[in-house]
């Protein structure tokens, strides 16, 4: 299906520039928790890239937003969501799976 089709109502999602595809896309606890198994946490490539640029590369939110082709506010929302998901994974001992949304464009601009 072409980009932007079949999403229903609302605006089309803007393309996100991704500079690095994660080599490992599935994280799980070495020792599963004894409690009832919870569903995995799903992180998007957009959230992963925001986390990588700001927390790993040390870019400002403004610089990271420009690199991804989004506003600082959009970058902030993706970064906040990614940080929450990582914390949830660590605290609750849940699986984390990183998946594309279909609106990412891999760029070699570093």
From Swiss-Prot:
It comes from Pyrococcus abyssi (strain GE5 / Orsay). Pfam families: DUF134 (PF02001). NCBIfam families: PRK04217.1. Gene3D superfamilies: Winged helix-like DNA-binding domain superfamily/Winged helix DNA-binding domain. SUPFAM superfamilies: Sigma3 and sigma4 domains of RNA polymerase sigma factors (SSF88659). Belongs to the UPF0251 family. This is UPF0251 protein PYRAB12660.
